[in-house]
Structure formats: structure tokens, C-alpha cells
Amino acid sequence: MALSKSVKVFFIYILILFFSFGTLLFYWSLRRNRSKVNPELNIKQWAAVSDGLHNSNTDLTFWNGKFYLIHAASPFHFGTEVCRLVLRRSVDAKNWETVKEFQIKNEDIRDPKFAIINNKMILYVLKNIGFDPEPYATVLTSSLNGEDWTDWEELKEHEGWLFWRPKTHDGKTWYMPAYWWEHGTSILLKSTDGIKWENVGIIYEGLKNDETAIEFLPDGRMICTARLEGTGNYFGDLTGCTLISVSNKPYTNWKQTKSYVTRLDGPVLFSYNNKVYAVGRYHPKIGFLTKQGSILSRKRTSIFLVEEDKLIWLSDLPSAGDTSYGGIVIKDNYLYVCYYTNDIRKDFPWVLGMISQSDIMMVEIDLTGLKEITPT
């Protein structure tokens, strides 16, 4: 009798849990999007890729009169051997042709980054073998025409370092931020050909430091942002934040500060009108189970002003759920941004977005509008 009663109580608890979770899923599926897009940006938006897959991890460049877009295509956010990188090309950023698909045998592939160095297009990507993505190495391939690509080349001298996006100030020397595959340290490298890299020094150590982006200030100094995860708890961490670092040439001594406006995941930095901006992931609301980086919180792809001592949120882009990891091109007084997002009519939490369809979105922003919303 006692066992029977215990079994009944157990099943009652299971039913309550099932009903509660079902109610939560139903609410999430109906919740309308609350992105705050500044109307002064006069955004034009369209889906570059919408094919039912979980598309993610984008980058964008303009080379030889054409836009090049690359993104990951997978069943979901997590690591899988079937993931591929799709390279597309367009003259207007609206009508895209598929140029090539990249894969690595028996491995997951993600976080592609373009560089145009010495009239050659170089593509850096990260290799991953875990279901919960933890990339462990960087490889590269290159092309002289955007169509024919070399075999994958291992960066054995920098094994374990995960490359982000290189930048140059003089067109000769390129600088590459990279973070350690086990998290916690970011460094700066330099190169003249994009293939052979020399270690410049450490940017930052601590707080599960990873995705690190750089840009040059007008006076030649370098500014850097990095994703600081803190403890990396699935429900977020109040110590999660964005590192902002500034250094004079030769970029070996860094002045550090932290911004708690967001934990800037998937950052891309760019300059316009003597200001530095970032496009990255925004965590708009902090709560008990929705601290910085929580899988239960809403996410946005947003634009920020990056100052030497702080981040300033300027506007969301139309986005929701699993989103961010963008690329940018500035052309003809317009800012073109690619990024990925779940259904922008909804407002999924991050965890639901990870297993849902996500599209590659393009937006066109009049730079005059960006200037207008930027604090002076």
C-alpha cells in the first residue's frame, strides 16, 4: 500500500513537471518579439538564407566587386559531423549564388572568418569534436579567385589557439586576436602574409576569456573586446561581462576595464567617423535565472559604441533566440551586416533557439543614421 502511494505521488510530480514545462514551452512559442530597433537607423532587412536549417556563425566581406558571405549550416547549434560552411557570392547582397561548401571529415566546423591579404582571400575556421561545442584548433584555406581553394592548413606553431578576425592599420602588418581553446587567455599575433603568425603578447587572462575582437583607434592605438564568461554557469553569471582593452603600439601593454552592459558574444568591431562600434550578442534582461549568458534568457544582435572605458548600447537589430556572430561591410555610405537569428516574430529563450530553425539575416543601415544616434 505504501509503495503504491509512493508511486502515485511520484507520477503526480512527473505530471506537474510535464505540465509546467509544456506550459512554459507554449508561452515561449507565443511570446512576441520585443527587440528595440532605433527607427533613425532606417534599417532595411531581408533573409539571405532561410532553408529550414539551423544556420549560424557568419562573416561578410567585399572583394573584387562582389559580396562574399559564409555561414555554418547544421541541424542545430551543437557540434555535429554533418555541419558544413557554405560560401555564397552576390553583387547586391540580396541575390546569392552558392560558390562552395566546406567540411572537415568526422569533425564539426564553425566560426569562419575572412581576410583579404596580398590580393588573396583567406578563410580561418575552428575545428570541434564535442557535442557541446568547444573548438580546439584553427585551420585555414585560401583562394586567389574565391572559387578554387587550397587544402586545409594546420597552424601547428599556434596549436590550441582559436583565431578570430585579423585587422591591419597600414595594409602591411596584420594583427590577429586569438584565445586559448580551454578558455581564460587571449593573445595578439602579427603577420605579413596571413599564413605565418608571430606572437606579440598576452592581452588578458582570467574569467574564462574567449572570443576576442580588435579594431584600430584613429591615433593608431588598438582597442579590443573579449567575452568574459565568469564561471560559465548555464543559468548565467553576474561576473560575466565584456573586457575592453586599449594599447599603444607595439600592443604589448594593455589598459583594461570591464563593461557589464552585456557579455559581448560573437563580436565584430568596425570604425566609422572616428568612432569604434561593435555588433554582437546582447543580453537585455538580468534576473534570477537569466544572468549574463543564461540559456533561459532572451538574446539580441545589437549595435554598440565601443569607448575606451565602456560599451554603449545603441540599437537592437531584428533578432531573437540564438543569434549574433555577424560580419560587416561598409560600402557607399551604407553599413551591411549579416548575422543569424531565429524567427524575429517570436522571442525564444536562447536554449530553445539552439534547436530551432535560424536564418541568415542581412540588414542595410544608412551610416548617416548611425552617426545621428551616436553620443558625441
What are these regions (language model features)?
Residues 22-56, 61-109, 115-266, 270-321, ...:
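Beta-rich carbohydrate-recognition and catalytic domains
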Residues 1-17:
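N-terminal Sec-pathway targeting helices
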Residues 328:
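Hydrophobic, well-ordered secondary-structure elements that form the walls
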